[in-house]
Amino acid sequence: MLSIQNFSQVEADVTQIDANETFALFYPEQRPYFNEGNDIIRSNQDAVYTRSINDPLASTKLIHQGQKQRIYWLAAYDQNAPYLVAGENKSYSGEGNEAWANIFSYQRILNQGNHLGIMTTNRFFVDGGNGQLARLNGLIGIGNNIDLNFEFNYTSIEEPTKDWIDSTEKQGGKTVSLDGETKTGNGLDIRLSRANDNWSSTLIYTQYSPLFEAPLGFINQNDLRSFVFHQQHVRYPKSTSSLIQYFSANLEGVLNYNIAGTQKFAGIEASSRIVWRKNFRTGVELDYTFMENYEGFIGKRFTEFSMWNNYNPSEAVSIGAFFSVGEELWYDEDDPAIGDSFYAGSFSTFQPNSNLRIRTTIRYGQLRNKNDQSLYFKGYLARSTINYQFNNNLSFRLISEYNAFDDELFMHAAIA
């Protein structure tokens, strides 16, 4: 299909709390045109992120899904391409200019859902500078309900000479600023999983070299080796009248190192999700960090507990709330520390009739110094979305959001 159209997304992004973030935040793709066929180019390493095609003037797209093969090809001319440089402890971003973008993926379907695939992505800036990525990936069953999922990415970047990123820092021996340097990097993700009716286990090894960047992906951290073990147990009731309709328990352990071998993180997470009778849901999570290394500061033995509940008394009403309390590392380059954190919020949906739907959310967060309880940050995000469907062809949407962290009010109205 050839498309020259309005590429705007259906709904504005829900703002995330970024008061203590050093890496760029991931926002999911919401534009219908770019979402179509995204399962073919899905990447465990986010080697492809179609939102990196930010403001397309025109695009051509081809999707083929057959019994033996799947093909995805997309080309676009972007009027305002973003630029993201990954780092070990933080990422750097800037607004670029016009660029040509291209994504091609071929997947060979084997027996029993196995597959092998190749992919290339390319971006060429009109004023100079380009990036190339090549990927090999696959899913192979190796018996006894064991699956091997792998992905290898190789990138070659020729930076533009631009002032889009203002930084004097270095990463992997190269400058972060865009001064025409050439970089090559690689990423590797290997997942071994085994599952039956009630149990599933997954081992994950992920690696990002110090200069790994993806021209049309979302790589906000590199110089990383990560080892993850995940175990899940699931139970279903024998009767629809049982108090508990679904139960899952999860345990996950994480070990992170940089490529030089310095330990960056060690922690475990235990969580559970319960679906109760009469449309009530509960989730709990306990995180324990043995150690975390940020810019040479090593925080040890801190904990966070979180819980959420959701209730749907009818199809017209959904209400929920969450909270999280514990300890958190304050990511300040000059004075990092462990602080006392607290987050809470609510979310609800009301649909009084078939035409009108109202959604509201409020999220509060704060972090305090453990010694004197002085504030590192404090604020909240409040958002409401009103949808009114006049008929099958006409609808109205009004979004209002207030960000108390930045004292900003955002409003967006749309007719579709």
Each predicted region: which residue ranges?
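Outer-membrane beta-barrel channel domains
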Residues: L2-L255, D287-M291, K300
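Exposed, low-structure sequence patches enriched in small/polar residues
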Residues: D55-L57, G131, E151-A416
